[in-house]
Amino acid sequence: HEATHQLNEQVGHTPPDKWVNEGLASYFGASKLEDYNLTPGKIEAKAYPVWWLGKLRPTGDMQKDFASGRVVPLRALISNSGGPDLDTHVNQWYLGYWSLTHFLLHGEKGKYAEGYRKLLAGKSATLADFERDIGPVDVVQKEWYQYLQGLAGDDVAGNVIVVQ
């Protein structure tokens, strides 16, 4: 996670916006390491913030989850404004950063990956940049929420598992 921040700063020069910075760091930090090979996007269920999927799993009622602070709304994640208090809901914010990044790269059969990479090559990742390069926040939010809900499944014993 921290190495990703350093690489972004010194080599990648990605936009400094928090949702991009923390999203990429969480994305790589929660990617699976097998036989000394990191597989970006292959989810390590025991990594932070993924391990919070069990406790903070979306209920299926997007508006209720936003209102309760269970899930941070996409507009708040991107603008770093609104949404639940970061001090008391830090895990919800980081689960949002991670899942949004994972969704933009892998969700909807990769339809947002090109736009996300274009955004990463720019100087900023504001709400206007997001809508220009990726799409309307309200449309993307619905798809991302469904994706986040689908990341957590139940096994026979009722334990939350990461599904892909």
What are these regions (language model features)?
Residues 3-8, 24:
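Active-site His/Glu-centered metal-binding helix of metallohydrolases
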